[in-house]
């Protein structure tokens, strides 16, 4: 992702958290009208970010300033990246060649697609600004131009690149797996959210860069199909997002496996390895079914579909292009017998995995009991270990990312740290400890865990992990010591505000 801060880092797939497009300063003489029209439609965005601290969830991290880019689109809207305005407490917009900054506000965010829409209420801001339209995805090897405000100067800059690849990529901002375009351009912080232009139309929104390994000068952008999906989703103001049918698959490129699951010669597809309860696929698909096609797209043995003669991508894209509530036709094979079924597209749930994805613009949950800080495990917490979190975060927590949820267990609860006091003597050095049960009752999720503590009638509360190790807290002493511990550690409340709101 690319905004003007020093918070670059790498995720486990090697994608940098800063996107950087080489800036070629624009010379302000002899520009034709079309170029000038594009220039005036590219906006610099200033933000003050105040993200919560997931190590001490009652506090905010030190506020910091950052900047990114955006472009004016229809309806007095400015299109940018979600990561440019995520956790923002204050947003401003500045026009090309105009020193004035205007207060802006966020009207819609899709963290999944790393896209956001902001606007400026001052009507004078949009005067003489021509909205840019959304174009079509360029063909491979076509040249595109990227506009934005990278660091190193205050004026608008431009870079050119060649579209080299279009395929599903992990979006670094929120970890989504969506279609993305790749261009061969070096990059600099500040271009995040800037438009990728061809034929005077937006054909992408700059979002991230590849770093590490041998790949150099590679930038990624959100393609037109994803942009249109988000804009259509924003029409009613409700963020429905992208659908998830509730099953997981693996490639089926082994001839022996194809024969074992009853595929005929020439048939291809992907093997269903997991069907989640209470999902659109529940009761309709079974493990070891083979998904042959989605709508009109036949699925190859490696899990790809053919979008055009020159474009293969993951079959998930055929699902992504639907909106919530639409019907999706799925053709499948079960033990050699073929069938078709329409599944209703439902909003992706965040609890298919035991570890929820990174969340933004939210207050973290926590509960302090007996001086022990308990929190739900999510990617926000894991990433708090720094840009090298895949190596520096506790292995016991990282392993949880590979586990599916179940009706009995939908979330992981962690005893993050012990706030030392008489009530928790013997446990002062315990930290990052996964709680499996409370007084013999399995932990389902953080809300149920908190309710077990709040409603406890036993003399002692016994926390146990999967290996049988126990942490025992006397309930009366926990209640008596609560105000003292909160005062000593300057903590405003024993739990997050919304935990018991219902």
Q: What function would you assign to each model-found segment?
A:
Residues 1-12:
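N-terminal secretory signal peptides that target proteins for export/translocation
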Residues 32, 52-75, 81, 100-103, ...:
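A conserved glycine-rich beta-strand in the N-terminal activation segment of trypsin-fold
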Residues 41-47, 52-53, 59, 121-131, ...:
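Active-site region of chymotrypsin-like
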Residues 67, 81-86, 148, 164-165, ...:
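Short beta->alpha transition motifs characteristic of CBS
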Residues 48, 59, 74, 82, ...:
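C-terminal recognition in membrane/secretory proteostasis and scaffolding
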Residues 74-156, 189, 339-340:
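Conserved active-site neighborhood of the chymotrypsin/trypsin-like protease fold
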Residues 50, 109-113, 164-172, 252-254, ...:
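Short, conserved beta-turn/loop elements at beta-strand boundaries and strand-helix junctions
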């Amino acid at each position: 992702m690319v905004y003007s801060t020093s918070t670059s880092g790498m995720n486990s797939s090697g994608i940098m958290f800063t996107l950087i497009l080489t800036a070629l300063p624009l010379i302000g003489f002899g520009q034709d009208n079309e170029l000038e029209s594009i220039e005036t439609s590219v906006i610099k965005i200033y933000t003050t970010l105040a993200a919560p601290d997931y190590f001490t969830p009652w506090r905010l991290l030190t506020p910091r300033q950052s900047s990114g880019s955006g472009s004016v689109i229809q309806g007095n809207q400015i299109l940018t990246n979600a990561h440019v305005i995520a956790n923002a407490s204050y947003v401003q917009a500045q026009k090309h060649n105009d020193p004035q900054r205007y207060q802006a506000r966020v009207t819609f965010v899709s963290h999944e697609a790393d896209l956001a829409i902001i606007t400026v209420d001052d009507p004078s801001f949009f005067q003489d600004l021509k909205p840019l339209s959304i174009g079509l995805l360029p063909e491979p090897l076509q040249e595109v131009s990227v506009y934005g405000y990278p660091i190193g100067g205050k004026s608008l800059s431009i870079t050119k690149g060649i579209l080299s690849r279009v395929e599903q990529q992990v979006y670094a901002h929120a970890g989504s797996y969506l279609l993305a375009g790749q261009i061969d351009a070096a990059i600099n912080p500040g271009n995040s959210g800037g438009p990728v232009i061809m034929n005077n139309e937006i054909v992408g929104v700059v979002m991230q860069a590849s770093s590490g390994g041998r790949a150099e000068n590679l930038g990624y952008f959100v393609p037109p199909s994803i942009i249109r999906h988000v804009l259509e989703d924003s029409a009613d103001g409700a963020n429905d997002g992208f659908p998830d049918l509730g099953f997981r698959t693996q490639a089926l490129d082994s001839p022996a496996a194809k024969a074992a699951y009853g595929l005929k010669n020439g048939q291809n597809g992907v093997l269903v390895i997991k069907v989640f309860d209470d999902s659109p696929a529940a009761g309709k698909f079974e493990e070891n079914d083979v998904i042959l096609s989605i709508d009109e797209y036949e699925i190859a043995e490696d899990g790809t579909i053919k979008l055009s003669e020159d474009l293969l991508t993951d079959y998930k894209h055929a699902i992504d292009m639907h909106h919530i509530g639409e019907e999706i036709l799925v053709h499948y094979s079960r033990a050699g017998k073929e069938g078709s079924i329409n599944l209703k597209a439902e909003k992706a749930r965040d609890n298919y995995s035991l570890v929820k994805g990174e969340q933004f613009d939210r207050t973290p949950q926590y509960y302090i009991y007996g001086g022990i800080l308990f929190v739900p495990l999510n990617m926000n917490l894991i990433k708090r270990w720094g840009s090298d979190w895949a190596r520096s975060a506790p292995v016991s927590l990282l392993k949880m990312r590979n586990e599916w949820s179940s009706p009995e267990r939908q979330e992981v609860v962690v005893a993050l740290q012990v706030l030392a006091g008489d009530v928790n003597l013997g446990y002062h050095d315990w930290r990052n400890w996964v709680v499996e049960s409370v007084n013999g009752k399995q932990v389902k999720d953080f809300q149920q865990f908190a309710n077990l503590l709040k409603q406890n009638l036993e003399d002692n509360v016994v926390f146990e992990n999967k290996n049988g190790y126990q942490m025992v807290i006397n309930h009366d002493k926990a209640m008596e010591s609560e105000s003292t511990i909160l005062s000593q550690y300057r903590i405003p409340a024993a739990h997050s505000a919304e935990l018991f709101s219902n």
